[in-house]
Amino acid sequence: MEQLARLYHDHLRVLNQRVCEILSRENLSGLVIHSGQPHRQFLDDLDYPFKVNPHFKAWLPVIDNPNSWLVVNGTDKPLLIFYRPVDFWHKVADEPNEFWAEHVDIKFLTKADKVAEYLPADIDEWAYIGEHLDVADVLGFARRNPDSVLSYLNYHRATKTEYELACMRKANEIAVTGHQAAKTAFYNGASEFEILQVYLSAISQGENQVPYSSIVALNENSAILHYTALEHTAPAQRRSFLIDAGANFNGYASDITRSYAFEKNIFDDLITAIDNMQLQIINLMQPGVSYAQLHVETHYKLAQILLDFDIVSGDVQGLVEQGITSVFFPHGLGHMLGIQVHDMGGFLGDDKGAHIAVPEAHPFLRCTRELDVNQVLTIEPGVYIIDSLLNELKQDKRQSQINWNTVEVLRPFGGIRIEDNVIVHRDRIENMTRNWGLNR
């Protein structure tokens, strides 16, 4: 924890430098960052699970306390307006005494609607950063989520501080523990629902604490890209298992996927091939490389795998250009990762908001930037038997290039995805996920 505290001090220094630059550029006095506030369910007296403003938790690991505020100007010590109501119905947040608390000034807010008493008097010279524009209106903010400010912050958020990298390594360590437990549960005969409970128990995080809804899919369900339905009964025949699940540490996310076959067969061999391909793509990563080009290169490598396994016929170039590989691999190679699972800034060409478009043939790619030092990204290629996409392909001449017998053999297994979290260094790539022992 002492090391984390030292790294956090430098983390704040970097954030303050960024704020100073954008305030000077935009002629602002500072930023007032709202943690957020509860959302009430329609026609109910219950709130949805609270999700903190990512720009708030970029500064400090307070992720579960709505109605809090952060006042920063890049020069003075950040002011945290910490919400601590008098409330006998709910658990009230403890007074902060963690490693980060000494680095900020703290004032306690007992009534959410009294926050104006703690905000700067010249509020029209400050920008509001947050979700609740109605609150910003009432408080008198003239500038609310300026595009220029958000573009600047989102662009530079891609470059992680050493504190952030330390948090993400820990988030990977935690998630790997859960993945290993989930794998054992699969081979022991657990249902999707039971596997998820094993995973969450192993990482000691609840469904609302993990950074995204975990995907736990058996057999054909593995072909559903964002499958979260969870069957409570184990299938009569156990063939395959895909788990896409992460963990949270100090507000930073890990995002890891693994696929398994219950027996040694063609599907198990295909998992090995995709795993090897994923590692080959990671080896191509270095500063200056276009992430979009890595995605395209993945399609060429996948085309060769499809040929090797007699899933398709033709040649590598033609399979990619005709979009046949996209039928089997319809999503992007991955995305930026940080305080959000899909971290902002993946399409920004500079800190003024220039947009780098996705390749026309690959509309679902989530990152088009060039790689740079201290960026963190996921690499998650896959191959799936998705009936809706294959049915479209059946309607044109490309259907003759599909070995439908092999497709039928693979259909009951669903799909494969292998996902690691990697850091781009100046002279190497750090695979956080594999470094904690989660290999094939």
From Swiss-Prot:
User: What InterPro entries does the record point to?
Assistant: Creatin/AminoP/Spt16_N, Creatinase/aminopeptidase-like, PepQ_N, Pept_M24, Peptidase_M24B_aminopep-P_CS, X-Pro_dipept-like, X_Pro_dipept
Tell me the residue numbers annotated for binding Mn(2+) 2.
244, 255, 419
* EC code: 3.4.13.9
The domain of life is Bacteria
Q: Which family does it belong to?
A: Belongs to the peptidase M24B family. Bacterial-type prolidase subfamily.
Q: Where does Mn(2+) 1 bind?
A: 255, 335, 380, 419
Q: Which cofactor does it need?
A: Mn(2+)
Q: Per UniProt, which keywords does this protein have?
A: Dipeptidase, Hydrolase, Manganese, Metal-binding, Metalloprotease, Protease
| Cofactor binding remark | Binds 2 manganese ions per subunit.
What is the role of the protein in this entry? Splits dipeptides with a prolyl residue in the C-terminal position.
Q: Please name the source species.
A: Shewanella halifaxensis (strain HAW-EB4)
Give, as one word, the top-level EC class. hydrolase
Q: Which GO terms describe its biological process?
A: proteolysis
The record's GO CC annotations read: cytosol
Q: Which reaction does it catalyse?
A: Xaa-L-Pro dipeptide + H2O = an L-alpha-amino acid + L-proline
By what name is this protein known? Xaa-Pro dipeptidase
Q: Write down the NCBIfam families for this protein, in alphabetical order.
A: PRK13607.1
Molecular function per GO: aminopeptidase activity; metal ion binding; metalloexopeptidase activity; phosphoric triester hydrolase activity; proline dipeptidase activity
